[in-house]
Amino acid sequence: MDFLQINGGAKLNGKVKISGAKNAALPLIAMSILAGNDIKISNVPNVADIKTLAQLLRNLGASAEFLNENSLKINTNDINSTKATYDIVRKMRASILVLGPLLARFGHCEVSLPGGCAIGARPIDLHLSALEKMGAEIDIKDGYVVCKGKLKGATISFDKITVTGTENIVMAAALAEGKTKIINAAKEPEVVQLCEMINKSGVKIEGIGTDDLTIYGSGGKLLKFSDFSVIPDRIEAGTYLCAGAITKSKITITNANPNHLVSVLAKFNDMGFNFEINDDEITIIPPKTIKPTEIITSEYPGFPTDMQAQFMALACVADGVSVIDERLFENRFMHVSELSRMGADIKLNGHIATINGTHLNAADVMATDLRASSALVLAALVAKGTSRVHRIYHLDRGYENLELKLRNLGADIQRASE
């Protein structure tokens, strides 16, 4: 199994190009099930989760061909199965995104209950109750969600904001008969891009970018999509800014969208960092002393839960006491025990972490999920000595060429096998 070996203490400098957003690409790939034409998607990140979803489509009978490392051509005209099997779904929670489009197009589907990162319960009940309101009959049988029914427009009010739930229902509503209204919809940039692409395909969507969406379904008519490019990954962008921050290095990220990073940049400002922003480039300028901060995770446009672990690593070396309140997911502090192995001073009380800034020392640590693994890499960049980060298959699910990009910035980092 691969691990990363990192010698801490190197200063970083230079530029790093941000990849396309994994969390935007996944629903856009699932959206191809709604299409009656070939779709070409560019700026697709070359990460494991994307390859998994492309393979899932192939298993259904679609063609999904990588034209190069970051471009994907999909045709779903020859889908001959509507069963997404456990062997592929178990690798990735986002596989549930095929549920809405498969049901809307074919009137039946079976999707294995999802896998992926082990972060709390993350139930899919919200997806299922919404589809039932649209006319679906749903059973959970032998570990599969079994759905059938012709979907009709309905008013869906989510009790809790759900990103994948919003995406699933938007896609289902696109082919449903009549008007669907989604109240308390997610507003993330990844949801916005999905809505924009469907809107351009001829299905009218009102309220894009708000928490109140109205979708006028095509009544089963397949959609025609233009070629498009995936938006930049705001979480990857934030992670590389954290790499510059934790090593007190001036670095520049390119191909980023500063408008998607407002809450993250504000927290960096609180901690004493400044920025130069020029179109799609952001340069982070470190202070002499990193100030502590207080963070509460929330839905977009609030501070993203997917940046919580990285900022915890940064808080570990701040001058003072920081507090992080994780409001969105349970069990999302699994990196704490590993950071503690490196000398971090962190106390947990339920969903609140209190971090007393200190110096970090190298250690062997183990990744438990995607964002936790990036936090351990960040900590290792500044820890004294040589660290090894194990179970980095979590990293490969969501970060494209992480060690190569960090090495190009000057980090002393190598991938090796044990």
UniProtKB/Swiss-Prot annotation:
Its main location: cytoplasm. UDP-N-acetyl-alpha-D-glucosamine binds at residues 93, 122-126, 306, 328. This is UDP-N-acetylglucosamine 1-carboxyvinyltransferase. It is an enzyme of class 2 (transferase). GO terms for molecular function: UDP-N-acetylglucosamine 1-carboxyvinyltransferase activity. Belongs to the EPSP synthase family. MurA subfamily. GO terms for biological process: cell division; cell wall organization; peptidoglycan biosynthetic process; regulation of cell shape; UDP-N-acetylgalactosamine biosynthetic process. The keyword Nucleus does not apply. Coiled coil: none annotated. The lineage of its organism: Bacteria, Pseudomonadati, Campylobacterota, Epsilonproteobacteria, Campylobacterales. Cell wall formation. Adds enolpyruvyl to UDP-N-acetylglucosamine. It is found in: Cytoplasm. Keywords: Cell cycle, Cell division, Cell shape, Cell wall biogenesis/degradation, Cytoplasm, Peptidoglycan synthesis, Pyruvate, Transferase. Phosphoenolpyruvate binds at residues 22-23. The modification 2-(S-cysteinyl)pyruvic acid O-phosphothioketal is found at residue 117. GO terms for cellular component: cytoplasm. Its EC number is 2.5.1.7. The active site is at 117 (proton donor). It comes from the Bacteria. It catalyses: phosphoenolpyruvate + UDP-N-acetyl-alpha-D-glucosamine = UDP-N-acetyl-3-O-(1-carboxyvinyl)-alpha-D-glucosamine + phosphate.
